[in-house]
Design a protein with these regions (language model features):
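Short helix-adjacent coil turns
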Residues: 4, 39-40
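Terminal, low-structured helical/coil segments at or just beyond the last alpha-helical repeat
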Residues: 3-7, 15, 21, 25, ...
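A short alpha/beta connector and helix-capping loop motif
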Residues: 36, 50-51
Length: 101
């Protein structure tokens, strides 16, 4: 929580929110996190669900990368459904690079 400014994140995300149909799945995932960080879990759930749908249809994503992304994004969706926001554990970046997440 000390590493982020959720109000500013939501301000910046407004442009993206207005263009939700034009966004790709990573952008939708980011908007969902900004919404959740500001307590708007219902809309965070909507954006994360749309992100998962678009990610599943991404033909440029390999099967392995799709499975890993689905796992991470579904976990975030579960948090939003339980009124919890998502904070990246920066140690997870090394795990993702190593293919363990």
């Amino acid at each position: 929580p000390d590493q982020r400014d959720s109000v500013r994140a939501l301000e910046l995300a407004q442009f993206m929110i207005q263009r939700r149909d034009e966004l790709d799945w990573h952008e939708l995932d980011t908007v969902a996190a900004a919404l959740a960080a500001n307590g708007d879990f219902a809309r965070a759930t909507q954006f994360q669900t749309l992100a998962l749908e678009k990610m599943a249809a991404d033909e440029d994503l390999s099967k392995d990368r799709r499975a890993a992304a689905r796992k991470r994004m579904s976990a975030r969706l579960g948090k939003y459904r339980n009124d919890r926001d998502y904070v990246l554990d920066y140690r997870a970046i090394d795990e993702m690079r190593a293919g363990r997440l």
